[in-house]
Amino acid sequence: MATAYIIGLGRSGIAAARLLKIQGWEVILSDRAHSPNLEITQQELGQEGITVKLADHPSLIDSNLPNLIVVSPGVPWDVNFLQEARDRGIDVIGELELAWRSLQSSPWVGITGTNGKTTTTALVAAIFQASGLNAPSCGNIGYAACELALSQTKTKASSFDWIIAEVSSYQIESSRELAPKIGIWTTFTPDHLSRHKTLDNYYAIKASLLRRCELQIFNGDDPYLHQVGLHQWADAYWTTVKGKEHLLCDAAKGVYLQDNWIVAFGELIAPLNLFKMVGVHNQQNLLMAVGAARLAGIEKGAIAQAIATFKGVPHRLELITNIDGIDFINDSKATNYDAAEVGLVSVNASVILIAGGEAKEGDDRRWIEQIKAKVATVLLIGEAATAFAQRLQQSNYEAYEIVETMDNAVKRGLELAKKQQAKVVLLSPACASFDQYQSFEHRGDHFRQLCQALKE
């Protein structure tokens, strides 16, 4: 029996293990961590015939080499163990690639980019589903991709009409055959450089996915993508919120805003006022989603209906509550400077900003410009608080307080908003969450709980 070794005991890894088990593989699941909860999972999977090794540091032993290694998205692609496995000719792939091998009879929409991926994925899925298509989403929202493959294998169901996949740079690295029918590239700015080393590397990884797609849609309002533009992507479809004259392509291949209408490939689709999400960046996301829908043959009426009923995505400029006329907004997904800058641009009022966490590399200057223009006080939390305070001071901005925790920040945020007549308390951290939380979702959920408790 062929042996598969899966690294990472998260949702993706467990789904991959179950899929391979059903397909007749001997499956070993490995994780570096060890905890009582993981021991429970170990026992449950053991009953399904899946071996789980905890506190495990895998090595390649000649007498017992696996035929396949499946890597979860959080595992660096260039660690020695995986490099050695590839050198020895072992098939090393990511969880998404494993799912693709089972699901490639369905057409995929693959959405990638530094920021905007998740909202665009949610919009595409909402529009496709509103038209009656069986089009589940996978990635950061919806299912793990292997969960979709598993459900189809178990039920022997017919193929999905479409699969809508959010694809990170980590997943592209480990998915050499993944080839969506429609590819969307939302934005491109420096991020994940601790893993990808250089901007050129990061761009090349993203571009490799788009080159395998049959049809490509690009955000023409993104400065970097606009710059590489037509000389690299001559056959692509382009979007812009700035009007037809700003398209990088012929209007017949463009999706754009004109006189507050959404226009796709020269045809009026829907009035923009149907769309309730704030921010120009969300209008950009919408245009890419509409482009994908029209390329998939979806009718205008279904698109308009989905736009009108779309409520947004948790942790992305999510309005939590209003207390005494002050909006509390959760933008926990803003894990870098560019996303946090967009969060501030999207709010048309004086702001109390909660920022900080585990800092990332990047250029913070435009973010700080927005702070100076919009923010009454910055409340700093987490590991980056001291460094952020110094950076703000260097920029001649002194209206900040180091409050350390989210509990302190939410309480203090309400006090200061009342005192300074700010209309919004915004969590938009510009940082990863791992210093204090398991994920940006965990951080955003905690913010939501604290806001709701404050209202009560």
UniProtKB/Swiss-Prot annotation:
Top-level class of the enzyme under EC nomenclature: ligase
Protein's name in the database: UDP-N-acetylmuramoylalanine--D-glutamate ligase
Gene giving rise to this polypeptide: murD
InterPro entries in the cross-refs: Mur-like_cat_sf, Mur_ligase_C, Mur_ligase_C_dom_sf, Mur_ligase_cen, MurD
Enzyme Commission number(s) of this protein: 6.3.2.9
Main location: cytoplasm
Localization: Cytoplasm
Any Pfam family: Mur_ligase_C
Family indicated by similarity: Belongs to the MurCDEF family.
Lineage: superkingdom: Bacteria
GO cellular component: cytoplasm
Catalytic activity as recorded in UniProt: UDP-N-acetyl-alpha-D-muramoyl-L-alanine + D-glutamate + ATP = UDP-N-acetyl-alpha-D-muramoyl-L-alanyl-D-glutamate + ADP + phosphate + H(+)
Keywords assigned by UniProt, alphabetized: ATP-binding, Cell cycle, Cell division, Cell shape, Cell wall biogenesis/degradation, Cytoplasm, Ligase, Nucleotide-binding, Peptidoglycan synthesis
The protein's role, per its UniProt record: Cell wall formation. Catalyzes the addition of glutamate to the nucleotide precursor UDP-N-acetylmuramoyl-L-alanine (UMA).
Binding site for ATP: G113, T114, N115, G116, K117, T118, T119
GO molecular function, one term: ATP binding
Native source species: Rippkaea orientalis (strain PCC 8801 / RF-1) (Cyanothece sp. (strain PCC 8801))
